[in-house]
Amino acid sequence: MEFSTKALDWSKAGQNGFLATKTDCLVVGLFEGQNLAGVAKALDVATKGLVGRLVKQGDFEGKRGTQLMLHEVAGVGAARVLLVGLGKEADFSDKAFADAVRTAVRALSSTRAASALWCLAQQAPQQRDVAWAVITTITLVREAGYRLLERHPGLKRANANGKPNGNDKSSLRKVVIAVDTGNARAATQAVVRGTAIANGMELTRDLGNLPSNICTPTYLANTARGIAKRHKLKAEVLGRKQIEALNMGAFLAVTKGSEEPPQFIVLRYDGAGAKQAPVVLVGKGITFDTGGISLKPGEGMDEMKYDMCGAASVLGTIQAVAEMGLKLNVIAVVPTCENMPSGIATKPGDVVTSMSGQTIEILNTDAEGRLILCDALTYVERFKPAAVIDVATLTGACIIALGHINSGLYARSDALADALLQAGRRAMDTAWRMPLDDEYQDQLKSNFADMGNIGGRPAGSVTAACFLSRFTEKYDWAHLDIAGTAWKSGAAKGATGRPVPLLAQFLMDRAA
C-alpha cells in the first residue's frame, strides 16, 4: 500500500480547492454535535449544507465508532465521501483517534475504493502533533490490511469463504494523508517512519504466525541475513560449535533435545559514529516450546510457535531503524532454538554453567527462555552498550498480572524505564513497570547451584526478571515481558507485531 501526504489550504475548499481532488473516497471526521468546523465545515459549504442537514436530521451525529458512506456527492471530486464519527471533542483521546482510523478502514474495506484522500490527521488529539497522527494512521491502516495468507499463499489454498486467497482483501492501494501547509515537512518524514514501523510490524507478525516447521532457528537466521543484505547491515550467525566455544552452557542446555541446530544471531546497524555506544536489543527466539521434559499440556500448545515473538520483534525493529535511517547505533541479538523433549534432553535437577560462570540448577525445563537469554545478556557486554533491552514471551505469570493490554517492564534505572514507558504511550503500545526489589532474589536460591531457574509460584514474572538481572550488572538494562501482548488467541488469532512500535519510538526519541 502506498502512502503520501498532501499539504492543503483548508480555506480553499471549493471548485479549485482540495474538495475537488479526484479520488475514490474522501475521508472526513466529524465531532459529535451540530457545530461543524474545519474540513467538515468546508465540506458542508461545498455541498450546500448537506453535512449540516444530515446532522440536524439525526442521520449522522458524529458519535464515536459510527460512519456514513455517501456516493456521488455534488460539489465534491471524490466518488465517495466517508463521514467518520469522532465522538465528543472534549473526550477526543489517542484511543478515540485510533478508533476513528479503524472505523474508516473497516468501511473502506467493504467497497472497491482503491484510493483515498484522508482528512483525519489534522484532527489529532490536542496533545499530539501531525507526525504522531501520520505515523499512527499508517500503522493502523497497514495493521488492518495485514493478511498472512496473501504474503505466504502456499500455506492455504482457499480463504474462509472457500475463495482463492486474495479475493477477500481490501481494494485500497493508495492513501493520501491531508495535512496543513505548515506541517508538510514533518508529515513527509512521518510517512517514511510510519511505513518503516508498519514494515517492521508485518515482518514480526509474519515470523510469529508462520508454523514452527517453517520458521525454524535456521529460518530466523536466514531472515536476519536477508535484512542485512537489503539494508546494508552487518550480520553474524554463530552455530553450535561457536556457541560451545563461548561456553554458553545455559543456552546449550535448552537446545539438547532438538534436532534443529541452534543459531545465535547478531545484526549491527551503524547509524552514528563509532564512538557512540550502541543500544542493544536482545530477543528470545524459541521457535517452538514444548516445555521440554517439563512437558506443557497439549491444549493450546500450537500457540507455542509464538515463543519467538521477542526475536521477531527485535528483527522487525532493527529493520525499521534501518529504513528510517536513524542516527544511532543499534545491535540486535537473537539466541534461537527449539525446546524439545528427547532421550538426551536436559532434565529437571540438572546443573549447568552459564557463559558468565554462574551455575544454574534447572528445576523446570519449561523456564527455558531465561536460560537462553542469560547467555545472550552476558555476550552483549563486549559491545559496551549504552543500554540493553531484552524482549521475551517469558512468563504466563505476566499474563495473570497484566492481561493482554500492557507488556511488563522491568528496569533498575528510572530514566530508562521512564523513556520506555513514554515511548509506549506515544506509540499506543503500552507497558507497565513492575517491581524488581532485591527481596525477590531469595526465591531463586538453590542448594546445589548459584541459583535455580525458577522461584516458585509467587511473583513468577518478577522472579524471572530477577534471574535475568543477575547477568546485567555491567550496563543499563530493561526487560520487556510480552507474553500477554505478542499474540492473540481465539477468532482474532495471530501475532500482534508488538512491541515494535514501542521500541521504534524509543529509538526515534533517542536519536532526536
UniProtKB/Swiss-Prot annotation:
Q: Which residues form a coiled coil?
A: none
**Disulphide-bridged cysteine pairs:** none
What cofactor(s) does the depicted protein rely on?
Mn(2+)
Gene Ontology cellular component list: cytoplasm
In this chain, Mn(2+) 1 is annotated as bound at 289, 366, 368
Reaction it catalyzes: Release of an N-terminal amino acid, Xaa-|-Yaa-, in which Xaa is preferably Leu, but may be other amino acids including Pro although not Arg or Lys, and Yaa may be Pro. Amino acid amides and methyl esters are also readily hydrolyzed, but rates on arylamides are exceedingly low; Release of an N-terminal amino acid, preferentially leucine, but not glutamic or aspartic acids
Q: Give the EC class as a word.
A: hydrolase
Binding positions (Mn(2+) 2): 284, 289, 307, 368
Under the heading InterPro entries, the entry gives: Leucine_aapep/pepB, Macro_dom-like, Peptidase_M17_C, Peptidase_M17_leu_NH2_pept, Peptidase_M17_N
* This enzyme's EC code(s): 3.4.11.1, 3.4.11.10
Report the co-factor binding details.
Answer: Binds 2 manganese ions per subunit.
Annotated GO molecular function terms are: manganese ion binding; metalloaminopeptidase activity
- Cite the entry's keywords alphabetically: Aminopeptidase, Cytoplasm, Hydrolase, Manganese, Metal-binding, Protease
Q: What does this protein do?
A: Presumably involved in the processing and regular turnover of intracellular proteins. Catalyzes the removal of unsubstituted N-terminal amino acids from various peptides.
Q: What is this protein called?
A: Probable cytosol aminopeptidase
What is the organism of origin for this protein? Answer: Cupriavidus necator (strain ATCC 17699 / DSM 428 / KCTC 22496 / NCIMB 10442 / H16 / Stanier 337) (Ralstonia eutropha)
